[in-house]
Amino acid sequence: MNIPAIRGKIGNTIYYSANFTFQQINDLVKKVEGEIYTSAPLKERIQRSLTDNSGKIKQYILDRNDRFFNALVLAVYDGEPQWTEIRFELEDNTFPNVGILYLNGREKIFPVDGQHRVEGIKDALKKNLALANETISVMLIGHSTSTEGMKKSRR
């Protein structure tokens, strides 16, 4: 899958800003699994919170034509993401950091920030398939399953 994106960097974290359709959110983004939140009570609190808040978000999506959300922050690991920069100039200005992020389909993607919105989007899509082509901004960041990588994703 080729994703048009803008590449950015803050500190030592590289991220990609892009848009996903609601259908892509449904198909590609999975719930946070146990390897990130190892504490059972924390996982239970997150799940309870997801159930309550995602229902409100689902209704907001279904009821409002003027709906809007801020960007989802999604962690990507496994697979072999590849970045291809597209260089272009406009009026003597160059624009690096614009390009295509390629995902081969073996990547695992989960929400770091936006779990409620992800689940609300999925639930709304089940009720109204016409929402499939709506888009939401996403920030994609790399995730490592190392101890340090998991700590970073929890922050």
Regions found by a protein language model. Give the residues of each.
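Basic- and aromatic-enriched surface patches that contact anionic nucleotides/nucleic acids
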Residues: 46, 68-74, 78-79, 86-155
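N-terminal extension/subdomain marker
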Residues: 1-70, 74-102
